[in-house]
Amino acid sequence: PDNFADAGYTVPESMEDLKTLTEKIVADGGTPWCIGLGSGGATGWPATDWVEDMMLRTQSPETYDKWYKHEIPFNSPEVVAAIDEFGYFAKTDANVAGGAGAVASTDFRDSPKGMFSSPPQCYMHHQASFIPSFFPEGTELGTDADFFYMPAYAGKDLGKPVLGAGT
């Protein structure tokens, strides 16, 4: 939180604000995101969380339900739009620590570490709620790291979706 506040950044209220913040961090000479999709034989699975979140922010809940029920194909325009939204963050070299080429090869467990360097290698990380277990030992949540809601688009009437999962 200190790195974020010291740089003059505030928590975005909308997806439009999050994209503006991403661009501002780049313009300020920083790197907005740490993203890692590496996971051995399961490499790529963290991207599903991003795509699901983007699906819920670009499409109606009914469309999301059709998608997970396999009533619309993975290459439907709605799903492609959600993948493209994730691509905005992950496929732009300046947006990601190590550049876009590092996204697939960076292990998801290691990906948040850049937030804890000085100066920070990145300011934000998006991952499941278990990710603090991979933060550096001694990290105090609320002091050394904090969280904010992945905002919805202000220009869409889709509410404030939340993605949950279980095992």
Indicate residue ranges for each PLM-predicted region.
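Extracytoplasmic/periplasmic substrate-recognition and gating elements
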Residues: 2, 130, 137-167
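Stable alpha-helical elements in mature extracytoplasmic
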Residues: 3, 14-21, 43, 47-50, ...
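A local structural motif
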Residues: 6-10, 90-107, 120-121, 139-144
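Paired acidic/hydrophobic, glycine-rich loop segments that form the ligand-binding mouth/hinge
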Residues: 34, 123-127, 146
